[in-house]
Amino acid sequence: MPAVLREGDELILHLMIQPKASRDQIVGLHGDELKVAITAPPVDGQANSHLIKYLAKQFKVAKGQVRIVRGELGRHKTVAIESPRQIPAEIHALLETQG
């Protein structure tokens, strides 16, 4: 299963989250997933909220257009982004290699 998929006007991301990182960043491929480092700790949903906010900023969409489809309580998550207005270079490169 690829780390990034296009389904209609949605972008589906299979992510491996690294909480409590020194900075927020899309690290790159990690096996079949895209590794994303975030500064928030994995406590009381803080990491999920922070991840949604970070991805919304990266894809230039409202936070309501980013939803966690699977993996709310774990490090491995599937996230859907509705109608992204911008695609970060790391993810664009992955989409290009998929054809």
Swiss-Prot record:
It comes from the Bacteria. Pfam families: DUF167. This is UPF0235 protein ASA_3628. It comes from Aeromonas salmonicida (strain A449). InterPro entries: DUF167, YggU-like_sf. Belongs to the UPF0235 family. GO terms for cellular component: cytoplasm. NCBIfam families: DUF167 family protein, PRK05090.1.
